[in-house]
């Protein structure tokens, strides 16, 4: 009964209003408030500040600065294995595996369309049909910057408006096509393994999503927006393997997609496996 009421509330709550309010709180610079709130959060979620560049939680100008904190050099070593595909973020594997019949597995009894996930453009979705995916969930205690699984050159970025349901095991199991319904930012890179999609999915009280090249991406009008970066008028944007590409100001989930016969995920990884940014998720397959 409790679970059912929680799911019903997800449909009834004013998602974007709550997220705007959360954003105001997260940007508050009133010292006594932001210090008390940040201390409470760090204690409540057992945040490990020993690996942060700035360990004192009260030294951050606002909660968002704390939440998107940088780590000390060497805190996240990159897997040196040749051909390793890195985890883009700290968190836990939500799901990973093959993309079958154009759909990505979400949870028992649920999947969602690659086409819808990427914003509805068939040309964008086609290279990933029959490929592989990995979904990483970032919990509140985790490091919330997202990094490159492989070196890549940005080709296209798509902001896809949508709902902002909470993201957790309960909603994954009960909200159909959760990740293809929530607000998200789709980034398409050209890599040594062909096209790679890195999708940053928002969630309830996720105030904003940023990228290192565009800054704040989530626009106030909440309209589908596509920006192409492979045009002659734009300087190429190339990011090295392990480089930061974006961050969440609260929440949520990063999804990586590859085309067919490009990667093989590590056999020891499964739903629920903890991962850290820079850890190997799998290996690139030998080229034919």
Curated annotation (Swiss-Prot):
Query: Which residues participate directly in catalysis?
Result: 90 (charge relay system), 147 (charge relay system), 252 (charge relay system), 252 (schiff-base intermediate with substrate)
Q: Which UniProt keywords apply?
A: Cell membrane, Decarboxylase, Lipid biosynthesis, Lipid metabolism, Lyase, Membrane, Phospholipid biosynthesis, Phospholipid metabolism, Pyruvate, Zymogen
Tell whether Cell membrane is among the UniProt keywords.
yes
- The modified positions for Pyruvic acid (Ser) read 252
User: Which positions does the site annotation Cleavage (non-hydrolytic) cover?
Assistant: 251-252
* Documented EC number(s): 4.1.1.65
Q: How is the protein modified post-translationally, according to the record?
A: Is synthesized initially as an inactive proenzyme. Formation of the active enzyme involves a self-maturation process in which the active site pyruvoyl group is generated from an internal serine residue via an autocatalytic post-translational modification. Two non-identical subunits are generated from the proenzyme in this reaction, and the pyruvate is formed at the N-terminus of the alpha chain, which is derived from the carboxyl end of the proenzyme.
* Molecular function terms, GO-annotated: phosphatidylserine decarboxylase activity
| Name assigned to this protein | Phosphatidylserine decarboxylase proenzyme
Q: Please provide, in alphabetical order, the Gene Ontology terms of the cellular component aspect for this entry.
A: plasma membrane
Co-factor remark: Binds 1 pyruvoyl group covalently per subunit.
Q: Which PANTHER family match?
A: PHOSPHATIDYLSERINE DECARBOXYLASE, PHOSPHATIDYLSERINE DECARBOXYLASE PROENZYME, MITOCHONDRIAL
InterPro entries associated with the record: PS_Dcarbxylase, PSD-B, PSD_type1_pro
Q: Which cofactor does it need?
A: pyruvate
Q: What is its main location?
A: membrane
**Where does it reside?**
Cell membrane
Which reaction is catalysed here?
A: a 1,2-diacyl-sn-glycero-3-phospho-L-serine + H(+) = a 1,2-diacyl-sn-glycero-3-phosphoethanolamine + CO2
Query: Which processes are annotated in GO (biological process)?
Result: phosphatidylethanolamine biosynthetic process
Quaternary structure (record): Heterodimer of a large membrane-associated beta subunit and a small pyruvoyl-containing alpha subunit.
């Amino acid at each position: 009964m409790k679970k059912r009421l929680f799911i019903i509330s997800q449909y009834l709550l004013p998602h974007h209003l709550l997220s705007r309010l959360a954003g105001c709180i997260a940007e508050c610079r009133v010292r006594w408030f932001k210090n008390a709130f940040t201390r409470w959060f760090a204690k409540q979620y057992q945040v490990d500040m020993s690996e942060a560049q700035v360990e004192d939680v009260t030294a951050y100008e606002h909660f968002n600065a704390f939440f998107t904190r940088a780590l000390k050099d060497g805190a996240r070593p990159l897997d040196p294995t040749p051909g390793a595909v890195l985890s883009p973020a700290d968190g836990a594997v939500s799901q990973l595996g093959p993309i079958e019949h154009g759909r990505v597995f979400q949870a028992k009894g649920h999947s969602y369309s690659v086409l819808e996930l990427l914003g509805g453009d068939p040309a964008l979705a086609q290279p990933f049909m029959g490929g592989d995916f990995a979904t990483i969930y970032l919990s509140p205690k985790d490091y919330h910057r997202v990094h490159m699984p492989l070196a890549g050159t940005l080709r296209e970025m798509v902001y896809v408006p949508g709902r902002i349901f909470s993201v957790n095991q309960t909603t994954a199991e009960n909200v159909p096509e959760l990740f293809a319904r929530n607000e998200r930012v789709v980034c398409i890179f050209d890599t040594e393994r062909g096209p790679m999609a890195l999708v940053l999915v928002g969630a309830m009280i996720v105030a904003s999503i940023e990228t290192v090249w565009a800054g704040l991406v989530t626009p106030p009008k909440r309209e589908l927006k596509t920006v192409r970066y492979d045009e002659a008028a734009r300087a190429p944007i190339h990011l090295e393997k392990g480089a930061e590409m974006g961050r969440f100001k609260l929440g949520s989930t990063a999804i990586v997609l590859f085309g067919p016969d490009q990667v093989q995920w590590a056999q020891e990884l499964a739903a629920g496996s903890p991962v850290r940014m820079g850890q190997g998720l799998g290996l690139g397959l030998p080229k034919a």
